[in-house]
């Protein structure tokens, strides 16, 4: 009897060690350890052995509004449950972002350091949008990327995106975007000679064909391409194919299942066409966006935890679709991690990243509406009233009940 008991105990210990060993192996898996230093070869993203790499992951929303969703716990959940291999930290420059509040870069640092600890790649995104010409804040961009590349240039995890979405008919690749990149890239290369740099292209990073005709000389540059499945279709896929034929390396650093406004839809059939297109061409991508904002491109439902552990009910239709697509191609099958504990489930989570909808007593604190300015979610003063943009708009006067402006007082 004693012998049988001893054998049983040994078997139990062996089984326990096997389970622990497998769990540790899954938790310790690092896509960065697997692929190492990324580079460009023949217009394609490759690992340190020269093998093609396709990264898939999520982009944050604006860190100044929804930064509470960008933290070690949420990124770990995305790695372990979704299977992401890249995370994009979207630091708006205007709209209450870095130019007005430089402290938002601390959230970028938090994202980068979490990604390093978790062994995934991370995109540091200089998110120009309403400031449509990257040259508007060129000097600030140079200072910012000098700091980031000095801090993190030794880590192969890091990817720099130096101009999210240049836009406007007077902002072209040849005259504005490429000259800007030719000033910012050397600042990064002074500290970081190797890591990938993504450069935005014209018309909200759609005009990759123009960049392909006049490429930058840095060997490890990629060109940003963005699309929204409910708005963009075959004509833009043709532009990507043209750019690839010219040997340009393309990174889809932002895409959504919605219309280009970030809302409307979702368009899952159209999104699947795009997913297939990107897979067939081995294009890396980051989906917009990790937030609980009440818009269809958001991955989470209102009220979702900012630290991961999301149930199916907490995922939006877009989030459910994107999670499934990432999990389908994960190098290591994602585990089913234990949701992080909530120390006080009765208390609602704070939402410090969202703008305060309550206007100040003095409307003069906000600028007057300007028909020539591009707005995305800014607050303006017009006809004795404060208004906030609900989506991208230009030359649409506040006051139209079906328009993009919402009254605040």
From Swiss-Prot:
This is Endoglucanase B. Residues 326-372 are annotated as: Disordered. Residues 334-343 have a biased composition (Pro residues). PROSITE patterns: GLYCOSYL_HYDROL_F5. The lineage of its organism: Bacteria, Bacillati, Bacillota, Bacilli, Bacillales. Its EC number is 3.2.1.4. The keyword Hydrolase applies. Belongs to the glycosyl hydrolase 5 (cellulase A) family. It comes from Evansella cellulosilytica (strain ATCC 21833 / DSM 2522 / FERM P-1141 / JCM 9156 / N-4) (Bacillus cellulosilyticus). It comes from the Bacteria. Substrate binds at residues 61, 65-66, 92, 127, 228, 260-261, 288, 293-295. The keyword Metal-binding does not apply. Residues 344-354 have a biased composition (Acidic residues). The active site is at residues 165, 254. One of its GO terms (molecular function) is carbohydrate binding. It catalyses: Endohydrolysis of (1->4)-beta-D-glucosidic linkages in cellulose, lichenin and cereal beta-D-glucans. Gene3D superfamilies: Carbohydrate-binding module superfamily 5/12 (2.10.10.20), Glycosidases (3.20.20.80). One of its GO terms (biological process) is cellulose catabolic process. Keywords: Carbohydrate metabolism, Cellulose degradation, Glycosidase, Hydrolase, Polysaccharide degradation. The gene is celB. GO terms for cellular component: extracellular region.
């Amino acid at each position: 009897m004693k012998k049988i008991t001893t054998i049983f105990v040994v078997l139990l210990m062996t089984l326990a060690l096997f389970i622990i060993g497998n769990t540790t192996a899954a938790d310790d898996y690092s896509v960065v350890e697997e692929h190492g230093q990324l580079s460009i070869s023949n217009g394609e993203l490759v690992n340190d052995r020269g093998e093609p790499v396709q990264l898939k992951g999520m982009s944050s929303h604006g860190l100044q509004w929804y930064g509470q969703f960008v933290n070690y716990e949420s990124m770990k959940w995305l790695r372990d449950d979704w299977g992401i291999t890249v995370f994009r930290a979207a630091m708006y420059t205007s709209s209450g972002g870095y130019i007005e509040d430089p402290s938002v870069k601390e959230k970028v640092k938090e994202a980068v350091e979490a990604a390093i600890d978790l062994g995934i790649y991370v995109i540091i995104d200089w998110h120009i949008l309403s400031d449509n010409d990257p040259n508007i804040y060129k000097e600030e961009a140079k200072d910012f990327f000098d700091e980031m590349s000095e801090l993190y240039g030794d880590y192969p995890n890091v990817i720099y995106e130096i101009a999210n979405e240049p836009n406007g008919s007077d902002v072209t690749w040849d005259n504005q975007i490429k000259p800007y990149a030719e000033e910012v890239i050397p600042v990064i290369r002074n500290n970081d000679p190797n890591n990938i740099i993504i450069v935005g292209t014209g018309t909200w990073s759609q005009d990759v064909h123009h960049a392909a005709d006049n490429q930058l000389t840095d060997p490890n540059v990629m060109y940003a391409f963005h699309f929204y499945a409910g708005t963009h279709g075959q004509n833009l896929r043709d532009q990507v194919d043209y750019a690839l034929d010219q040997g340009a390396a393309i990174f889809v650093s932002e895409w959504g299942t919605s219309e280009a406004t970030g809302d409307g839809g979702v368009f899952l059939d159209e999104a699947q066409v795009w997913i297939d297109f990107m897979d067939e061409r081995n294009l890396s991508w980051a989906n917009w966006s990790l937030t609980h904002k009440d818009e269809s491109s958001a991955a989470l439902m209102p009220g979702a935890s900012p630290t991961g552990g999301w149930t199916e009910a907490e995922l939006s239709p877009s989030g459910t679709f994107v999670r499934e697509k990432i999990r389908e191609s994960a190098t290591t099958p994602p585990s089913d991690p234990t949701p992080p504990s909530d120390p006080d489930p009765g208390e609602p989570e704070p939402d410090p990243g969202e703008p305060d909808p309550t206007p100040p007593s003095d409307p003069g604190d906000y600028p007057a509406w300007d028909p020539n300015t591009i707005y995305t979610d800014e607050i303006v003063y017009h006809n004795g009233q404060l208004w906030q943009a609900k989506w991208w708009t230009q030359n649409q006067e506040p006051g139209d009940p079906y328009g993009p402006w919402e009254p605040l007082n």
